[in-house]
UniProtKB/Swiss-Prot annotation:
It comes from Parafrankia sp. (strain EAN1pec). InterPro entries: DUF520 (IPR007551), UPF0234-like_C (IPR035571), UPF0234_N (IPR035570), YajQ-like_sf (IPR036183). One of its GO terms (cellular component) is cytosol. This is Nucleotide-binding protein Franean1_6074. GO terms for molecular function: nucleotide binding. The keyword Nucleus does not apply. The keyword Nucleotide-binding applies. Keywords: Nucleotide-binding. HAMAP family: YajQ.
């Protein structure tokens, strides 16, 4: 029988992202403080474009978007954005949704597992995810607890536990 293993991934459900953006756009249309500000939120691929006619209104739209993400159970760690930039009379802010674990984060997670994890547990980087194998299921449970206690600035999910 093969050794027990599980995968560490960082994925966000695209349907939930779409729902959160649609709820944000709907709330912007109905809220009085956004009236006549040209505020909008639109999803295009893996990024969300927020627009309004002032910098503080764009930041307010971002707050509404973050509130909707939290309500839909999406971690805010998966969002990456800069400062609003002016484009003509409008301010725009591009919010990128991170999918997968970046190489440097994957190396940091693997290093943490080797340093502080139980003996005999191995972590292999496979593209944008990690595969963790060990001799005992209890060791894998300890690795999961270790990683949940640590903050790697990416939302981690543990899947394919065998």
């Amino acid at each position: 029988m093969a050794d027990p293993s599980f995968d560490i991934v960082s994925k966000v459900d695209t349907q939930e992202i779409d729902n959160a953006v649609n709820q944000t756009a709907k709330e912007i249309k109905t809220r009085f403080d956004f009236r006549d500000t040209g505020a909008s939120a639109a999803l295009s691929g893996e990024s969300i474009l927020l627009q309004a006619n002032s910098e503080d209104r764009v930041k307010a739209v971002l707050d509404v978007l973050q509130e909707k993400f939290v309500k839909r159970g999406i971690s805010l760690k998966s969002l990456e954005h800069g400062e609003p930039r002016q484009s003509g009379k409008e301010y725009k802010l591009t919010v990128t949704v991170q999918q997968g674990i970046a190489d440097e984060k994957a190396k940091a997670i693997a290093k943490k597992i080797r340093a502080d994890g139980p003996k005999g547990v191995q972590a292999q980087i496979q593209g944008d995810q990690l595969r963790v194998t060990g001799k005992k299921r209890d060791d894998l449970q300890r690795v999961i607890q270790l990683l949940k206690a640590e903050d790697f600035d990416v939302p981690l999910q543990f899947v394919n536990y065998r």
